[in-house]
């Protein structure tokens, strides 16, 4: 005989609950109680309810990010796809070859796993901020990379991400979150690619099919399980424009930039009193950063949307 577990309401009698009984009848519920049981939440229906809530929160979070001026926005789930794991291994090879120059912080172990930055992290909201403005420096003037024309983007992106995080806390009081800009040890471009914001080009910058590579990125880690967007796929093809244009041959091979040869590194991060001779010879008018590899990218030669964000508009200097 099989064990039949009776409904407590059916067996309730004068404050007593009968023990479960064995019997030959496999149907232990009356028709009425079977109908009631059919109405009870099943695991599948409960999962569907949770999934609906997850979907609504995911979409609302992206809308909230758009309200802060971010476009594109996307979501990735931790630990990420196999391709992201390959990006993590590529970071180690890059470090092993010394391409980080003296940027020792690039080797921080936390860079390999967002869960080391936020305990219990489940999802990553990735955001992009377009800083393209159709303006050119005066002929003969010194040059600053476009991302430096406006206000310090670290502060701009961080402040906006924190507002989004506080909004998320209002929706989910028990959730944890952390705002990350590129000063945080996170594989930021790899996670942006994972969230569908664009693909990592051969010059190592993120490229969006409609906005090109003129955008800075940020991330909001959260313990909330959110719906992931499809990862972006590379559209660089056989193009080698950025590799060919680099005056110091810093792009040693597709997707591999040697900071020791990069003008941007030497004008921003290098703290030595003297620059290497090959760097001095190639500097030209560049005094802060370098945009050569992006200037020649075909994806930046399209009709790109200009940013009207007041924080990225060129300032006199």
Which positions does each model-derived feature cover?
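Intrinsically disordered, low-complexity, charge-rich segments with an acidic bias
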Residues: 6-40
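Short linker/helix segments within small regulatory modules
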Residues: 274-281
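SIR2/sirtuin NAD+-dependent deacylase catalytic core
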Residues: 238
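A short small-residue
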Residues: 143-145, 268-274
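Iron-sulfur cluster-binding cysteine motifs and their immediate structural context
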Residues: 70, 241-271, 283-311
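Short, intrinsically disordered, charge-balanced linker/junction segments flanking boundaries
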Residues: 314-317
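Short, small-residue-biased leader/transition segments that mark boundaries at the very start
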Residues: 1-5
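Auxiliary alpha/beta "docking" domains used to position bulky ligands
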Residues: 46-235, 285
């Amino acid at each position: 005989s099989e064990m039949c577990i009776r409904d407590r309401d059916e067996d309730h009698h004068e404050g007593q609950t009968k023990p479960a009984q064995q019997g030959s009848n496999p149907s232990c519920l009356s028709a009425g109680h079977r109908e009631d049981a059919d109405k009870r939440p099943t695991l599948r229906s409960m999962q569907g309810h949770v999934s609906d809530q997850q979907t609504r929160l995911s979409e609302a979070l992206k809308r909230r990010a758009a309200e802060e001026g971010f476009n594109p926005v996307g979501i990735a789930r931790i630990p990420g796809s196999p391709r992201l794991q390959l990006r993590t291994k590529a970071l180690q090879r890059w470090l092993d070859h010394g391409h980080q120059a003296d940027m020792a912080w690039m080797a921080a172990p936390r860079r390999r796993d967002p869960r080391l930055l936020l305990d219990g992290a489940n999802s990553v909201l990735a955001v992009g901020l377009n800083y393209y403005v159709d303006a050119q420096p005066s002929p003969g003037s010194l040059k600053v990379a476009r991302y430096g024309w406006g206000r310090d983007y670290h502060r701009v992106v961080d402040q906006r991400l924190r507002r989004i995080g506080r909004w998320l806390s209002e929706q989910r009081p028990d959730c944890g979150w952390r705002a990350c800009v590129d000063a945080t040890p996170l594989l930021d471009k790899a996670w942006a690619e994972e969230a569908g914001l664009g693909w990592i080009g051969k010059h190592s910058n993120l490229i969006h099919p409609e906005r090109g590579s003129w955008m800075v990125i940020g991330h909001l880690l959260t313990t909330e399980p959110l719906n992931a967007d499809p990862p972006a796929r590379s559209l660089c093809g056989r193009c080698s424009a950025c590799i060919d244009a680099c005056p110091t041959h810093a792009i040693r091979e597709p997707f591999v930039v040697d900071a020791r040869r990069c003008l941007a590194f030497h004008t921003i991060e290098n703290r030595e009193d003297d620059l290497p001779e090959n760097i001095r010879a190639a500097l030209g008018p560049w005094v802060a950063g370098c945009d050569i590899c992006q200037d020649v990218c075909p994806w930046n030669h399209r009709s790109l949307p200009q940013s009207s964000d007041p924080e990225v508009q060129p300032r006199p200097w």
